[in-house]
């Protein structure tokens, strides 16, 4: 329960930051430098700004992308445990290089973003190309596989979370699932 509360708190903080940037003609850009988490966070925020979803959908997108990133990163940490697969993706010590972490994080974020914002796939493909990663399925490295596996596990779970993403988040609770007491 405490973990869930922490995740919800982080999502709310990110969402509040998003609300402060929506509608600005030139949003402030984070100086990402070499931090791939910031690079992919900016891709997520840019997608939200360009295709503004409802606030709850925006918060959900941020949570999914960052959970996929965390789960990919956790595979390369000796103690961290992924949210969906636990320690099942843990990589051997020899594989725990910065290059592998970067690649896994990028592939996880990429898959999550393409799933959430399919109309922007060309933008995400270009970002991956800029980072030196192929998105055509030719990269069969373990790091790419870790990223895809981590993201797929998160996406499979979130596709069943009741948000109805597959149908444009349409209300699937007709006539009404909730009847308030009078």
Predicted regions and their residues:
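Acidic/polar surface patches and capping/hinge elements
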Residues: 26-182
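Generic cytosolic/nucleocytoplasmic N-terminal low-complexity/intrinsically disordered segments
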Residues: 2, 23-25
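Bacterial N-terminal signal peptides that target proteins for export
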Residues: 1-11
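Bacterial N-terminal signal peptides
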Residues: 9-20
């Amino acid at each position: 329960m405490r973990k869930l509360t922490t995740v919800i708190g982080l999502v709310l903080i990110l969402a509040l930051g998003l609300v402060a940037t929506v509608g600005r003609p030139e949003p402030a850009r984070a100086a990402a430098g070499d931090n791939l988490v910031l690079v992919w966070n900016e891709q997520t925020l840019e997608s939200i700004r360009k295709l503004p979803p409802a606030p709850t959908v925006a918060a959900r997108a941020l949570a999914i992308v960052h959970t996929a990133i965390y789960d990919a990163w956790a595979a390369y940490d000796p103690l961290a445990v992924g949210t969906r697969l636990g320690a099942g993706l843990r990589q051997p010590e020899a594989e725990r290089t910065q290059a592998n972490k970067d690649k896994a994080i990028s592939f996880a974020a990429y898959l999550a973003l393409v799933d959430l914002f399919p109309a922007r796939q060309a933008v995400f493909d270009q970002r991956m190309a800029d980072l030196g990663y192929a998105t055509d399925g030719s990269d069969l490295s373990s790091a790419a596989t870790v990223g895809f596996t981590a993201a797929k596990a998160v996406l499979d779970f979130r596709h069943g979370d009741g948000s109805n993403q597959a149908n444009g988040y349409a209300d699937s609770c007709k006539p009404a699932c909730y009847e308030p007491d009078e």
